């Protein structure tokens, strides 16, 4: 079963069942993606691979939606060519709100006209760099999925979910929502790394998300396992680590493995490629592939892999 991606450089053929890959010639920085083969209905991907995208991570590419689509697909295709079986789905963690210094959250889109609930701790600003409606439409058209992420501060997470779903829930690319817990009641936490997410709160968020679509997923992200729900588990819930600042790949893997061990019975995911780790990953041949292969080999419950936007223009995903 093949996923065929056509570009100006030629055809790129990625096969997930048999690890075969036809490499294109490199050199065309503005590659164009014409078609993405869809995963057959009823079959769930083995892995989700792509990019983190925020308005502040790589601002010079804020309006270049096709650029993000192409690289998410290329990264997923590259991983598909390195695994033994299954499908690899291109996915973008799409961040629509940012933590505010006053402890609240800034939404990068207009409040939906039909929304009448709480807006405590929220500011709505449409001029923040990314046209989220346009970006999500580009994902829809090209077979790239998205999870909407919040940096909620002290705003109500249930309200965050409802507002975003009213604004963007019509997009077929969306498969769920996520929260960066480092920015969850950050100002109220002693070390300003966010308050721990309580089991009962995670359960409420999960139930809210599933009320919109029973197939939707929820991720909770942090670098410190102590900030995660202690006992709450759900098949549609997964935990995402954005840990960074390591001296080498082995140290990163020790931390990532510890994260997985702490999240017993749950699927896990990882963000990597941070500038703070560039000293060692930049010395690798094909850093996205090398790091991903190590994660998948060492951590069986790792299903979600993302290169961060901060350095997404400094590596090749082919």
Where are the regions a protein language model picked out?
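Hydrophobic faces of well-ordered beta-strands that scaffold small-molecule active sites
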Residues: 45-51, 90-94, 146-150, 175-179, ...
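Aromatic-lined substrate-binding rim segments of carbohydrate-active enzymes
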Residues: 100-151, 201, 205-216
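An active-site-proximal structural segment forming one wall of the substrate-binding cleft
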Residues: 127-141, 153-176
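Aromatic-lined carbohydrate-recognition surfaces of secreted/lumenal glycan-active proteins
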Residues: 144-158, 206, 210-229, 267-277
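Substrate-binding cleft/loops of secretory-pathway carbohydrate-active enzymes
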Residues: 155, 159-166, 224-252
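Active-site cleft segment of glycoside hydrolase catalytic domains centered on the general acid/base Glu
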Residues: 159-163, 167-171, 178-214
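Substrate-binding cleft of secreted/luminal carbohydrate-active enzymes
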Residues: 244-318
